[in-house]
């Protein structure tokens, strides 16, 4: 429906472009239907809708194929960036999980934790906000663990989205390689 509306607005019917659009549309829908997991199907449908919405915003008629190519390169770039950035977050998670383990097992970890904060350039913030007693240290760690876990969850969701987007676009490009020839 969305594609038909775009073509209707522009009232220019280029048979070659129309054929190209329909093939892209057909292969994208085929990819979506092949997903065995309901969540994957929903995610890939949302991604495809995003691609079409981008086309509508840019007012491009008969250029869904170009959008696919642009989407592919743009998504690869995002995935690379996210992978690089999520490595440091992964390291932080390991550190905080280790500290959390110390808390749960009543190990004396305050000195080690302060050293860790110093390395992260967060020692001053810690001094300002918390006094040196066990309860406040625990509170500080709990606050930070929650924040970092939330960050990690957001990165994972973004990676899942971009990973599925790459799969969708790769699938269409594989079945319709002439898109590159534009």
Curated annotation (Swiss-Prot):
Protein name: Uncharacterized protein R741
């Amino acid at each position: 429906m969305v594609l038909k509306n775009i073509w209707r607005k522009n009232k220019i019917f280029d048979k070659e472009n129309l054929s190209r659009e329909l093939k892209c549309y057909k292969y994208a829908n085929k990819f979506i239907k092949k997903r065995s997991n309901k969540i994957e199907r929903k995610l890939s449908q949302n991604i495809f809708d995003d691609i079409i919405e981008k086309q509508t915003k840019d007012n491009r008629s008969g250029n869904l194929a170009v959008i696919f190519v642009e989407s592919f390169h743009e998504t690869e770039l995002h995935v690379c960036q996210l992978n690089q950035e999520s490595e440091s977050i992964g390291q932080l998670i390991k550190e905080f999980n280790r500290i959390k383990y110390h808390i749960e097992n009543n190990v004396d970890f305050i000195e080690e934790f302060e050293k860790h904060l110093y390395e992260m350039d967060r020692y001053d913030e810690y001094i300002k906000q918390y006094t040196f007693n066990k309860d406040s240290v625990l509170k500080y760690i709990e606050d930070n663990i929650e924040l970092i876990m939330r960050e990690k969850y957001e990165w994972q969701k973004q990676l899942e989205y971009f990973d599925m987007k790459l799969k969708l676009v790769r699938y269409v490009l594989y079945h319709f390689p002439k898109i590159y020839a534009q």
